[in-house]
């Protein structure tokens, strides 16, 4: 029985091929402890030679299934998106890992744009893609005949192509369970490469929060007329890491953005919480925008949908004029560059 050790540094997790055990820590593209710049975590993990698949949680599966069921409108041309599943990788690979989305245009404009930015920044690395949602992968394959690697397939591809130095950069919003799953799965391959480093998620340090605050306030500045409430919808989680939404709210308020509100679909602050907070003001208009990397099912339906229960209809029923901005954070150049910075820290850690 082999035991492996995986050291995870949130500033830039450097993984070396040594003997001992796996890893742990966080939740999907939904929540994170405001992690320390540098933290090592280890966990014992048995391996039998076969690579294991990380199952989706019930919530993740439900989200992916809901997205896969949305066939009432065109989500864009899948052929315009680069699945980045080619061989001929070379010795250096930068694997960008995302939950994924079956919304073709959003996938290209968010995840694809992040991958493009990373590719431009690291010409000595071949950039490849891995999704964590098998349901989305299967749906895109069935509907559009586009093959996207899951994380295990992407790691297998890297190993078969003789990659020696592997950097994994997640596009997760926060350090949560899905980030932990990624670290654990990468641990199973720690003896397949000379060096492995895992970059940190979007919201990890104080500087990250400030950078995201700056990005989202700048992109909504045209609506900030003093008469409009600007509300961001995150995913949310019941895990402790859900506190990052409160942290983002506090940072917005402290910076003087008192008409900016942060809520979630799955946890607190809820839609009711955000609506109640907005009603304490004297606003006539409301702008809704997702606080998510992609604009998928949650953004198009839970936020901007016309059916009862959506954020849009709830605010309209309360008498507000509502504008929905169905854009993922990944479309913003500032967010793309923040992921590049995180990837740079991971790349730099390979030589330490």
What are these regions (language model features)?
Residues 4-5, 28, 36, 51:
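Polybasic, lysine/arginine-rich low-complexity segments
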Residues 36-45:
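Short extracytoplasmic/periplasmic juxtamembrane "stem" segments immediately C-terminal to an N-terminal membrane anchor
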Residues 1-10:
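Bacterial Sec-dependent N-terminal signal peptides
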Residues 18-22:
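C-terminal motif of bacterial Sec signal peptides marking the signal peptidase cleavage site
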Residues 13-14:
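Repetitive helical segments and hydrophobic/amphipathic motifs
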